[in-house]
Amino acid sequence: MYIEITIDLKNYQQDSFDIRLSNYYSVKKLIDIVWQAKNMTEQPRQGAWIRVVNKQKIIQGTERLLDAGIRTGDRIEIL
């Protein structure tokens, strides 16, 4: 299933943006897709951690978005 989420890149001095992708991707793959979409030169921090802002939940890079409970409308901050 596809989900639509907001990605917050404030930790990397970038604006937030909306993206639509499969919830079967891992958090690490989500970060890879974001880096490609935004053509970012700065490397992501080690561990591929994210925070679901509206659920106050921190998730590691190996979890799938589906298993982590990420749904359409969530706001994701890449740590």
Regions found by a protein language model. Give the residues of each.
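Short, acidic/hydrophobic/Gly-rich beta-strand patch recurrent on exposed beta strands
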Residues: T6-D8, R20, W49-V53
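Short, contiguous acidic and Ser/Thr-rich linear segments
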Residues: K10-K29
